[in-house]
């Protein structure tokens, strides 16, 4: 089972990715993790990636596709894999197709922008333990304090409104066109496309995914 997750940052993909991995026994493939592993291993692709990153440049689509191809031949991908955060653009999706990387399901998590902003800017973190709260959906017992230690909670830089809105603009410009791309692919019988209502409670979204994936 080869799955791509689409959706804006904060649409709840991470939570459901965890569930899919455990339920179906497939690994999540993160391009960031792959790049770091390739550089560490000193493989030919890793050396190329290191040179590009050391020069402060962005790694090319060709190189990322080559890494994905190499990664999915590994034993843990025998039953499939889950891609989140890749492809980000139509040229990347085309390159994947040309490289013969077929996908069984494309799952789109649909959540309105304002709700995403609400979800993210309400997050509060206890830095030392990694505990995450939400002022509206999962508040601490005492406002602004960690339940366990009573220490101050903070807001991550990534969770500030300006940053969140910037990331949403980027998503709509670059990644949202993939929704149309994969809808067409599904009509052509090359994959199955499903839109999931990410505004529903986690358990309901999970049940919907089980229905889709079987």
From Swiss-Prot:
Residues 122-159 are annotated as: LID. It catalyses: AMP + ATP = 2 ADP. AMP binds at residues 31, 36, 57-59, 85-88, 92, 156, 167. ATP binds at residues 10-15, 123, 132-133, 200. CDD domains: ADK. Keywords: ATP-binding, Cytoplasm, Kinase, Nucleotide biosynthesis, Nucleotide-binding, Transferase. Pfam families: ADK, ADK_lid. It is found in: Cytoplasm. GO terms for molecular function: adenylate kinase activity; ATP binding. Its main location: cytoplasm. Pathway: Purine metabolism; AMP biosynthesis via salvage pathway; AMP from ADP: step 1/1. Residues 30-59 are annotated as: NMP. One of its GO terms (biological process) is AMP salvage. GO terms for cellular component: cytoplasm. Its EC number is 2.7.4.3. Consists of three domains, a large central CORE domain and two small peripheral domains, NMPbind and LID, which undergo movements during catalysis. The LID domain closes over the site of phosphoryl transfer upon ATP binding. Assembling and dissambling the active center during each catalytic cycle provides an effective means to prevent ATP hydrolysis. Belongs to the adenylate kinase family. Monomer. Catalyzes the reversible transfer of the terminal phosphate group between ATP and AMP. Plays an important role in cellular energy homeostasis and in adenine nucleotide metabolism. This is Adenylate kinase. The gene is adk.
